[in-house]
Amino acid sequence: MANVTLRNVRKTYPGGVEAIKGIDFAVGDGQFCVLVGPSGCGKSTLLRMVAGLETITKGEIDIGGRVVNDIEPADRDIAMVFQNYALYPHMSVYNNMAYGLRNRGMPKPEIDSRVREAARILEIGALLERKPKQLSGGQRQRVAMGRAIVRQPKVFLFDEPLSNLDAKLRIAMRVEIRKLQRRLNTTSIYVTHDQLEAMTLADILVVMNGGVVEQIGNPLEIYRKPASTFVASFIGAPPMNLIALEPDEIRAQFAGDVRANTEAGILGIRPEDLLISTEAAASGGLALELVVDAIERVGAETFVYGARSRHGEPVISAKPGELPPGEVIVRVPGQSAPAAGERIMVTAPREKLHLFSADGRRRIDL
C-alpha cells in the first residue's frame, strides 16, 4: 500500500496541445480514488502517466514517497486492469494469472499459492484450466483483476474496466470491485466516464474537464455542493436544472442579498428537490410555473419534463447546462404524474437552491 501524490502534473503533446494542465491531488494509503469526466477530459491520459505509459512534461508523480517520473512501469510497483481485459487467448486462466510472476523469476510454489489465493478471493477457482474464449465477459474481467492481485502491488490502476459489460453485469462487477478493494485495502485509482459508477465506488472523487480538475472531494459533498455548473450538470442523473436568471428575477428571488445581486447569474436545483405544489413557496423559496412536455415512468419514480413559463409564455434559458433550452426536470416518487400539456407549479425551499456566477465557473454560497 502507498500514498499517490501528483504535483503540478502537465502533459503537452507535439504541436503544443496541452492535455493535462497542472494537476495537484493526493490519494491516501488504502483510498479508492475515481477520476471521472467526459471523453477527452484527460482522465485516461493522467492514469497512464501514473502507470508510466505516458511521459510527464512537467511536475512530479510520487508513489509511496518515491518520485517515479523516470522509473519504468514495471518498476513502479503498480498493477493495471484494462477495459479490454488484455488476456492471452492461447493460455489457460491459471497461466494468464501466473505469466507476470514467472517473468519476474518467482519460485513456482509462491506463484501457485498467489494464483490460487486470488482465484479463491474472486471465486474463479473452477475456471483455472479454461481458456478466455470459454469465459463470459464478467469472468474475463475477474481473471484480469486476478492477474493484478497476484502481483500484490502498492497501487491498483483501473482504466474503464467495466465499459464492455452489459448494464446488469456492470452493476454486479461494480459491487465486486468495491468489496475487493476494501478487503485488500490497496490504494486504487479508477477511471470512468460513468458518473453513477464514480459516485458509488469512490472514497475520493476527482471531476475532470478539459485537462483540469474541476472539483475534488467526497462524492456526496460534490453532489450536494458542486463547485461549478459543469460539475452540477455532470454529477447526477438526471442532471441539475440550471436556469439563467434575468436581473429582475435575481432581485425578486434574493432581495437584500448583495452577493446574489452582484455576482449570481445561474440558479441550480436538483430534480428531486422540486415539489409539485398548489401552494406558494415558503419565504425565500423558489416557485416556477411549468408547462409539462413529457413524462418518463421508470418504475419506482417518474421524471416530469416541463418548459418554464413566465407570465403565461415559455422562457428560453440562455445558459441551460445540459438540458434543452428552458427545460426543467422534476423527479417525483411513484408513478402518478400530471399529463402532458398541463400547467403545474413547482416549488423548492431556499436551502435547496444553488447559485453560480454568470459564467458558471464559481459557486456562490449565501
Curated annotation (Swiss-Prot):
Belongs to the ABC transporter superfamily. sn-glycerol-3-phosphate importer (TC 3.A.1.1.3) family. It is a peripheral membrane protein. CDD domains: ABC_MalK_N. The complex is composed of two ATP-binding proteins (UgpC), two transmembrane proteins (UgpA and UgpE) and a solute-binding protein (UgpB). One of its GO terms (biological process) is glycerophosphodiester transmembrane transport. ATP binds at G37, P38, S39, G40, C41, G42, K43, S44. GO terms for molecular function: ABC-type glycerol-3-phosphate transporter activity; ATP binding; ATP hydrolysis activity. The keyword Cytoplasm does not apply. This is sn-glycerol-3-phosphate import ATP-binding protein UgpC. Pfam families: ABC_tran. Part of the ABC transporter complex UgpBAEC involved in sn-glycerol-3-phosphate (G3P) import. Responsible for energy coupling to the transport system. It catalyses: sn-glycerol 3-phosphate(out) + ATP + H2O = sn-glycerol 3-phosphate(in) + ADP + phosphate + H(+). GO terms for cellular component: ATP-binding cassette (ABC) transporter complex, substrate-binding subunit-containing. It is found in: Cell inner membrane. It comes from Rhodopseudomonas palustris (strain BisB18). It is an enzyme of class 7 (translocase). InterPro entries: AAA+_ATPase, ABC_transporter-like_ATP-bd, ABC_transporter-like_CS, ABC_transpr_MalK-like, ABC_transpr_MalK/UgpC-like, Mo/tungstate-bd_C_term_dom, NA-bd_OB-fold, P-loop_NTPase.
